[in-house]
Amino acid sequence: MNFLDLPEECIATMISFTSPFDACRISAVSKLLRSAADSNTTWERFLPSDYRMYIDNSLSRFSNKQLFLRFCESPLLIEDGRTSFWMEKRSGKKCWMLSARKLDIVWVDSPEFWIWVSIPDSRFEEVAGLLMVCWFEIRGKISTSLLSKATNYSAYLVFKEQEMGSFGFESLPLEVSFRSTRTEVYNNRRVFLKSGTQESREDGWLEIELGEYYVGFDDEEIEMSVLETREGGWKGGIIVQGIEIRPKELL
């Protein structure tokens, strides 16, 4: 039997075991393959099993492929706008950003040290502006049930300098980590906020990598941390948007 003689549903099921990128390439081969490759059967498999949690009535009329592209092209704000979710278009892997409001930041509600501000280039309503602290501590947690299985993830602190610049970070290294809360072993790295470790992002913000973590098939909680609590030197002048968690292979 010729492959193209198979029922469209069967072809769609086979295509669903490839990747979103491959499905788009297959759809360009012929009209029959395009119909199968663009079908809800194919794209249902590329969507997260819990995707219905992230959509409202305005998205309910979308086809599965349209939903997938919507998740990839425009991050969704959930949990009262404190968390951002999207998917990587080529692989369909899940990506997240926890806003500053979602993080545990020491002294963040003390206006002499931190202030909450709104700026136009943030995806969240509020970001945390650091005035000055001697104890710099930011922590966040996420369940691996929200991440893609069998995937190596990295976490990044997303920030920018205030207009007058930052201070105190030049000579004080930050201790950063990305680890399971089950382990008692702290494999912290030291990085400098103002050095070659920071990277510019397409959205105009900066980021530093906190670490890597392989997400297997067990559900557990993982923690991200950024600390400078040893030296006690005063530091300030940055704006924290949040912590982003995305697959390591995405550059």
Curated annotation (Swiss-Prot):
SMART domains: FBOX (SM00256). It comes from the Eukaryota. Residues 1-46 form the F-box domain. GO terms for molecular function: carbohydrate binding. InterPro entries: F-box-like_dom_sf, F-box_dom, PP2-like. PROSITE patterns: FBOX (PS50181). Signal peptide: none annotated. This is Putative F-box protein PP2-B12. It comes from Arabidopsis thaliana.
